[in-house]
């Protein structure tokens, strides 16, 4: 099966740390209470996946996370017949398991999946809340608690990879972005354990780098990468080397652009 799936148990005690940026928690809770699907839009590494994990734990629901990719098909989500012990046995995919169990199914970067995936989602994202399985003849009604959540990065969309309006309009949608600096400092310090003074410098650098998006860089540095740089620094790595490894090399292969980013870091840290 080509789906890359992560599962998460329930229980608010295990909720991953997430610092709200606005009213996204309230919107998600209201959508969940009304059995509405949710679409999260925002750049890579801004906290969408962490938010979903936090909300699943907060609501006490199991979570199936599927990392979508070019080869992900509807069969990967629904299931297929597999050979086991000399016989052919039907095996549910992550979407089917979530529908049966009343769990949250999160499709990360849904636009990366094959087009047949969106067709499967349509009957789950209207008042029918059903999942037809042609291979078995079943038509599964979603168990109480089932919720479909999908995400994508609008900045990566092109004419071949986009969500049709007919699909987008089936979801409650929320836009995410990188946290404002004071909140990002709090997040990075909490996640990495680095002192706030050095964390503040890394966040300032991240803001400067994000200003280059669309010019020298396809994408700005993510909060995730800032956490990586802070974590490396806290473990004793030289700050310049940590920035190079976590905030420069992952963004570009262009030697000239990398030199410019190093100069930017030097201007901030001296």
Curated annotation (Swiss-Prot):
InterPro entries: ATPase_dyneun-rel_AAA (IPR011704), CbbQ/NirQ/NorQ/GpvN (IPR050764), CbbQ_C (IPR013615), P-loop_NTPase (IPR027417). It comes from the Bacteria. Keywords: ATP-binding, Nucleotide-binding. The keyword Signal does not apply. The keyword Protein biosynthesis does not apply. Signal peptide: none annotated. GO terms for molecular function: ATP binding; ATP hydrolysis activity. ATP binds at residues 42-49, 102-109. Belongs to the CbbQ/NirQ/NorQ/GpvN family. This is Protein NorQ.
């Amino acid at each position: 099966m080509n789906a890359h799936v992560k599962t998460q148990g329930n229980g608010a005690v295990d909720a991953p740390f997430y610092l709200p940026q606005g009213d996204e928690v309230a919107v998600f809770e209201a959508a969940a209470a009304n059995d509405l699907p949710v679409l999260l839009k925002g750049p890579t590494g801004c906290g969408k996946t962490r938010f979903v994990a936090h909300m699943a734990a907060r609501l006490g629901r199991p979570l199936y996370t599927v990392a979508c990719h070019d080869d992900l098909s509807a069969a990967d989500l629904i299931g297929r017949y597999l050979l086991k012990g000399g016989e052919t046995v039907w095996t549910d995919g992550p979407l089917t398991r979530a529908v049966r169990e009343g769990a949250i199914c999160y499709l990360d970067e849904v636009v990366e999946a094959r087009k047949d995936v969106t067709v499967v989602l349509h009957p789950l994202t209207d008042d029918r809340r059903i999942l037809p399985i042609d291979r078995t003849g079943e038509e599964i009604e979603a168990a109480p608690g089932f919720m479909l959540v999908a995400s994508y990065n609008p900045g990566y969309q092109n004419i071949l990879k986009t969500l049709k309006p007919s699909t987008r309009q089936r979801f409650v949608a929320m836009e995410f972005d990188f946290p404002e600096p004071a909140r990002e400092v709090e997040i990075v310090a909490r996640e990495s354990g680095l002192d706030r003074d050095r964390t503040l410098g890394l966040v300032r650098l991240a803001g400067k780098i994000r200003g280059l998006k669309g010019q020298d860089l396809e994408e700005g540095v993510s909060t995730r990468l800032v956490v990586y740089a802070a974590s490396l620094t806290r473990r004793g790595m030289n700050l310049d080397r940590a920035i190079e490894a976590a905030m420069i090399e992952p963004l570009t292969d262009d030697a000239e652009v990398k030199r410019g980013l190093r100069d930017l870091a030097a201007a901030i840290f001296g």
